[in-house]
Amino acid sequence: MAKVLVVYHTQTGNTEKLALAVKEGIGSCGIDVILKKASEANLEDLLSSDGYCFGTPDYFSYMAGSLKDFFDRTCYPSEGKITNRPYVCFVSHGGGGKAVGSLETMAERFKLKKITEPLLVEGKPKKEDLQKARELGKKLAKAII
Protein backbone atom coordinates (compact mmCIF):
# COMPACT_ATOMS: atom_id res chain seq x y z
CA MET A 1 0.00 0.00 0.00
CA ALA A 2 1.18 3.53 -0.77
CA LYS A 3 2.49 5.63 2.09
CA VAL A 4 2.97 9.37 2.71
CA LEU A 5 5.26 11.01 5.24
CA VAL A 6 3.94 14.20 6.85
CA VAL A 7 6.81 15.98 8.61
CA TYR A 8 6.17 19.16 10.58
CA HIS A 9 7.25 21.38 13.44
CA THR A 10 4.86 23.10 15.79
CA GLN A 11 5.36 25.36 18.76
CA THR A 12 1.92 26.84 19.41
CA GLY A 13 -0.11 23.96 17.95
CA ASN A 14 -1.23 25.81 14.81
CA THR A 15 1.00 23.85 12.46
CA GLU A 16 0.08 20.57 14.14
CA LYS A 17 -3.63 21.24 13.55
CA LEU A 18 -2.90 21.71 9.87
CA ALA A 19 -0.73 18.57 9.77
CA LEU A 20 -3.55 16.53 11.30
CA ALA A 21 -5.98 17.88 8.70
CA VAL A 22 -3.56 17.01 5.87
CA LYS A 23 -3.24 13.51 7.34
CA GLU A 24 -7.02 13.19 7.37
CA GLY A 25 -7.21 14.18 3.70
CA ILE A 26 -4.53 11.70 2.68
CA GLY A 27 -6.09 8.92 4.74
CA SER A 28 -9.52 9.52 3.19
CA CYS A 29 -8.02 8.34 -0.11
CA GLY A 30 -6.91 5.01 1.37
CA ILE A 31 -3.23 5.83 1.72
CA ASP A 32 -1.21 5.10 4.85
CA VAL A 33 0.23 8.14 6.61
CA ILE A 34 3.28 8.52 8.80
CA LEU A 35 2.81 11.71 10.83
CA LYS A 36 5.97 12.82 12.61
CA LYS A 37 7.40 15.88 14.20
CA ALA A 38 10.56 16.89 12.37
CA SER A 39 12.73 16.12 15.39
CA GLU A 40 11.47 12.50 15.36
CA ALA A 41 11.43 11.81 11.60
CA ASN A 42 14.35 9.90 10.13
CA LEU A 43 15.91 8.63 6.93
CA GLU A 44 13.95 5.37 6.96
CA ASP A 45 10.68 7.32 7.14
CA LEU A 46 11.75 9.34 4.12
CA LEU A 47 12.97 6.41 2.03
CA SER A 48 9.97 4.19 2.78
CA SER A 49 7.40 6.79 1.70
CA ASP A 50 5.91 7.40 -1.74
CA GLY A 51 5.16 11.09 -1.18
CA TYR A 52 5.72 13.88 1.30
CA CYS A 53 4.10 16.80 3.03
CA PHE A 54 6.26 19.33 4.84
CA GLY A 55 4.76 21.78 7.34
CA THR A 56 6.39 24.59 9.28
CA PRO A 57 5.71 27.82 11.06
CA ASP A 58 7.37 30.88 9.54
CA TYR A 59 10.28 31.96 11.73
CA PHE A 60 11.89 35.15 10.48
CA SER A 61 10.96 34.25 6.88
CA TYR A 62 12.51 30.77 7.20
CA MET A 63 11.39 27.26 8.09
CA ALA A 64 11.65 25.97 11.66
CA GLY A 65 15.12 24.83 12.68
CA SER A 66 13.97 21.29 13.45
CA LEU A 67 12.63 20.87 9.91
CA LYS A 68 15.88 22.22 8.47
CA ASP A 69 17.69 19.71 10.69
CA PHE A 70 15.54 16.90 9.24
CA PHE A 71 16.53 17.97 5.72
CA ASP A 72 20.18 18.22 6.76
CA ARG A 73 20.14 14.71 8.26
CA THR A 74 18.48 13.07 5.26
CA CYS A 75 19.67 14.97 2.20
CA TYR A 76 22.90 13.21 1.30
CA PRO A 77 21.91 9.71 2.45
CA SER A 78 18.74 9.88 0.29
CA GLU A 79 20.40 11.41 -2.76
CA GLY A 80 19.12 9.80 -5.95
CA LYS A 81 16.73 7.51 -4.06
CA ILE A 82 13.57 9.65 -3.89
CA THR A 83 13.83 11.65 -7.13
CA ASN A 84 10.49 12.77 -8.63
CA ARG A 85 8.39 11.66 -5.69
CA PRO A 86 5.47 14.05 -5.13
CA TYR A 87 5.31 16.61 -2.35
CA VAL A 88 3.16 19.40 -0.98
CA CYS A 89 3.86 21.87 1.80
CA PHE A 90 2.17 24.31 4.13
CA VAL A 91 3.23 27.23 6.30
CA SER A 92 1.53 28.77 9.30
CA HIS A 93 2.55 32.36 9.89
CA GLY A 94 1.81 35.60 11.62
CA GLY A 95 1.86 37.80 8.55
CA GLY A 96 4.90 36.85 6.51
CA GLY A 97 4.57 33.41 4.99
CA LYS A 98 7.94 33.69 3.29
CA ALA A 99 9.25 30.44 4.80
CA VAL A 100 7.68 28.65 1.86
CA GLY A 101 10.68 29.70 -0.22
CA SER A 102 13.09 27.78 1.99
CA LEU A 103 10.82 24.71 1.91
CA GLU A 104 10.64 24.75 -1.86
CA THR A 105 14.41 25.20 -2.11
CA MET A 106 14.91 22.04 -0.06
CA ALA A 107 12.35 20.10 -2.12
CA GLU A 108 14.22 21.14 -5.26
CA ARG A 109 17.48 19.94 -3.70
CA PHE A 110 15.87 16.55 -3.07
CA LYS A 111 14.53 16.65 -6.67
CA LEU A 112 10.94 16.17 -5.53
CA LYS A 113 7.92 16.89 -7.74
CA LYS A 114 5.68 19.76 -6.62
CA ILE A 115 2.01 18.80 -6.86
CA THR A 116 0.30 22.11 -6.08
CA GLU A 117 0.96 25.54 -4.64
CA PRO A 118 1.75 25.68 -0.92
CA LEU A 119 -0.96 26.37 1.63
CA LEU A 120 -0.29 29.53 3.65
CA VAL A 121 -2.33 30.04 6.81
CA GLU A 122 -2.14 33.20 8.86
CA GLY A 123 -2.76 32.89 12.60
CA LYS A 124 -4.81 30.14 14.19
CA PRO A 125 -6.30 27.82 11.57
CA LYS A 126 -9.97 28.47 10.96
CA LYS A 127 -12.48 25.89 9.78
CA GLU A 128 -11.89 26.84 6.14
CA ASP A 129 -8.10 26.59 6.60
CA LEU A 130 -8.45 23.07 7.95
CA GLN A 131 -10.63 22.17 4.97
CA LYS A 132 -7.95 23.53 2.63
CA ALA A 133 -5.39 21.41 4.47
CA ARG A 134 -7.55 18.30 4.00
CA GLU A 135 -7.82 19.15 0.29
CA LEU A 136 -4.04 19.56 0.13
CA GLY A 137 -3.71 16.03 1.50
CA LYS A 138 -6.19 14.70 -1.05
CA LYS A 139 -4.28 16.33 -3.92
CA LEU A 140 -1.09 14.66 -2.76
CA ALA A 141 -2.83 11.30 -2.37
CA LYS A 142 -4.32 11.51 -5.87
CA ALA A 143 -0.86 12.17 -7.30
CA ILE A 144 0.26 8.85 -5.82
CA ILE A 145 -2.67 6.56 -6.63
Language-model regions, residue ranges each:
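FMN-binding flavodoxin-like domain, especially the glycine-rich phosphate-binding loop
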Residues: 2-4, 14-17, 21-44, 48-145
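Short polar catalytic/cofactor-binding loops
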Residues: 9-13
